């Protein structure tokens, strides 16, 4: 079986892939989508002996009947299941070691994510610190929008009479 340090780094890889793409994930359970991503990114899926379908079948085998996710222990069982198929000529232990080496230390790859373009006119139009006039009042120093408070002056209609506005200012006017 794998060494103790390999197991901890294997669990670390599990956690990284488990939280990928889900802001509410704790890292204790992995979805089928993230399991497939792990297998693809770590080159467990080679297209010949192990395909995406094989990965999905193994996921369904190791998870509970009504469960939609797998735990770290089930993840290790799933790797064991795939290791025999991925490395056919090796013994079970050697195949499991080899598949663990593929996964250990890997992180999810974010391919195809576009970066914002900050060139010429786009930079001037999107930089809120360069805004002038009433538009600069719409944003705070960090560039975050103020919402309706930045567009309109909000007056509270409070007081004894419906048309009396700006409650609490009468005393300031009388003292003059």
From Swiss-Prot:
An example Gene Ontology biological process: microtubule bundle formation
Disordered: annotated segments: 126-152
Compartments where found: Cytoplasm; Cytoplasm, Cytoskeleton
Keyword annotations of the record: Cytoplasm, Cytoskeleton, Microtubule
Biased composition (Basic and acidic residues): 134-152
Protein name per Swiss-Prot or TrEMBL: Tubulin polymerization-promoting protein family member 3
Location (main, coarse): cytoplasm
Organism, as annotated: Xenopus tropicalis
InterPro entries: EF-hand-dom_pair (IPR011992), TPP/p25 (IPR008907)
Function: Regulator of microtubule dynamic that has microtubule bundling activity.
